[in-house]
Amino acid sequence: MARKSSAPQFLSYGDATGRLSWRDAVEALRQGHTLPQAQIRDVFLGPPTGTMMSRSAWIEGLGYGAKTFTVFDGNAARGLPTVQGAMLVFDKDDGRLQAIVDSPLVTEFKTAADSVLGASLLARPDSRHLLIVGAGTVAASLVRAYTAVLPGIERVSVWARRPQQAQDLIEGLDGIEADLAAVSDLPAAVGQADIVSSATMARQPVILGAWVRPGTHVDLIGAFKADMREADDALMARAALFVDSRETTLGHIGELMLPIASGAITAESVLGDLYDLVRPGARRRQSEDEITVFKNGGGAHLDLMIASYIARVMAG
């Protein structure tokens, strides 16, 4: 007799409140990168201001997943989320649909855990001061993830184009043991930080290499299209460059495409991705003074790693 299939879980953002751990999410990504390299495919449709993306992945030993979502730049003015969608998770052995996960839940944990995994492998171990550039949707989860996983962080500064937005973010954070402050002088803040984590929608650089002191780790999140970037050529040329995935960043995202086109760097300037970095003996930070840059480009394989972690936790 054929086995009766169980109905897939629908996991909303509210369902997961208080049940997920940033440390466990980062560990899920680390472990996921010890598995065979994922097969991934992306489809992007629509104009720059209203894009639909479908990102699919298969990871041997983990399963299959597909996330479809829209990104509408003008939704904030409408009182709607900029990003909306859902993630489907399928069983690795028989292809059953196991879970449908709210896209913002996957994206929040994937994005911040991706950056923090990179920082845990590349930032100086004595890093104490974290600067968050941007106070949008991602910023709060970055503060929570960094301070949960890197307990040495004692000070968190937040900069935003609209100072009140940075202040509102600070006031909305609770349970953070680090000192929190909104800052208005971005060049000075960058120059004082040990880790700079930038999550903006910038199409022109907001972080200049001239501002960054030796030993800083710079985490670049915001750019996800070919015309977007957050760092200037000078920073990219000075730094040891790493990415979460060569496949989803090189040739796809302006953060790398634009400095390659200008001749500031080459594709070979990228020294490794997370598959490389998690391996024992990998090329990571070489000195206390080296500047490291990690481009968080995302990808369906990361979504699948995090969605599978969420589904396991929620299944009890």
From Swiss-Prot:
It comes from the Bacteria. GO terms for cellular component: cytoplasm. One of its GO terms (molecular function) is oxidoreductase activity. Keywords: NAD, NADP, Oxidoreductase. It is an enzyme of class 1 (oxidoreductase). InterPro entries: NAD(P)-bd_dom_sf, ODC_Mu_crystall, ODC_N. It catalyses: L-proline + NAD(+) = 1-pyrroline-2-carboxylate + NADH + H(+); L-proline + NADP(+) = 1-pyrroline-2-carboxylate + NADPH + H(+). The keyword NADP applies. Its EC number is 1.5.1.49. PANTHER family: KETIMINE REDUCTASE MU-CRYSTALLIN. This is Delta(1)-pyrroline-2-carboxylate reductase. It comes from Paracoccus denitrificans (strain Pd 1222).
